[in-house]
């Protein structure tokens, strides 16, 4: 039974491969749709709780700025991956002055914290780098990849320990996948999100040179150490060198003339923003 369990796992690994937008091979034991469904549940529960506590920002000036930047990025994300036009793109600003963070779940549900806006004080170009980076995690299916890696680790461990009980293997692996929703991305994923994010931002009309200044600000925000946002990110020296090389490649996208289209986000009171049918020019 032990050999059979390992054989099943090996066959699954061979067949469960995907390719990210950068061409990197990914392990995918969890479907993107499953990751989106579970992320949606977590997002709705989280936002409902925050709304009841009065922690969702309603300041129209802040929301307009965030919606404009993310709206322009979303258009470019859809161009890069047309299937994401079916996602329920959402964005919320969470009132937490201590949290220097932002994120985007599978399916395009986003949030950023007032701590990032207050402590980093990003320009629009810098904020576009943050949100472009986070959107890139969703584009590259990093949530499902993270869940898949957790399933593999747990499945192999259980397969060795209790190979005679395949139900236990699956239950444990699925539990590990759910836990992975709350875990950080790997450094490989972070580097990939840097690469995709700076391109999204440049194509959306935001200066790619802001990437370097943003991460310098982020590195300083933690005082004696980096903020949580950077806990699994590449080392600052390596990151700055990589971004500097990318800046020159991205400048032609940024310098293209003409208006940049913006995806319209319609916001109901105390609810995650939901999409309208068509993009509109800013």
What do these predicted regions represent?
Residues 2-5, 17-282:
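A Zn2+-metalloprotease active-site environment signal
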Residues 8:
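Metal-dependent nucleotide-binding catalytic modules
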């Amino acid at each position: 039974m032990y050999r059979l369990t390992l054989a099943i796992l090996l066959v699954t690994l061979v067949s469960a491969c995907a390719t990210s937008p950068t061409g990197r091979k990914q392990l995918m034991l969890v479907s993107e749709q499953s990751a989106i469904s579970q992320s949606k549940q977590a997002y709705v529960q989280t936002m409902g709780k925050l709304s009841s506590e009065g922690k969702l920002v309603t300041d129209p000036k802040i929301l307009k700025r965030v919606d404009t930047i993310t709206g322009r990025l979303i258009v470019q994300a859809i161009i890069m991956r047309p299937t994401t036009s079916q996602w329920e793109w959402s964005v919320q600003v969470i009132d937490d002055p201590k949290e220097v963070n932002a994120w985007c779940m599978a399916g395009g549900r986003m949030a950023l914290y007032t701590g990032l806006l207050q402590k980093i004080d990003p320009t629009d170009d810098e904020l576009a780098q943050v949100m472009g980076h986070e959107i890139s995690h969703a584009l590259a299916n990093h949530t499902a990849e993270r869940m898949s890696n957790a399933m593999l680790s747990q499945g192999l461990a259980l397969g060795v320990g209790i190979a005679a009980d395949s139900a236990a293997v699956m239950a444990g692996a699925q539990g590990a996948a759910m836990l992975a929703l709350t875990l950080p991305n790997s450094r490989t994923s972070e580097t990939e999100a840097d690469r995709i994010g700076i391109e999204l931002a440049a194509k959306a009309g935001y200066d790619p040179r802001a990437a370097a200044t943003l991460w310098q600000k982020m590195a300083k925000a933690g005082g004696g150490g980096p903020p949580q946002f950077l806990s699994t990110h590449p080392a600052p020296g390596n990151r700055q060198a990589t971004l500097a090389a990318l800046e020159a490649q991205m400048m032609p996208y940024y310098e293209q003339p003409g208006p940049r289209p913006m995806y319209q986000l319609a916001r109901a009171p105390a609810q995650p923003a939901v999409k309208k049918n068509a993009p509109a020019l800013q």
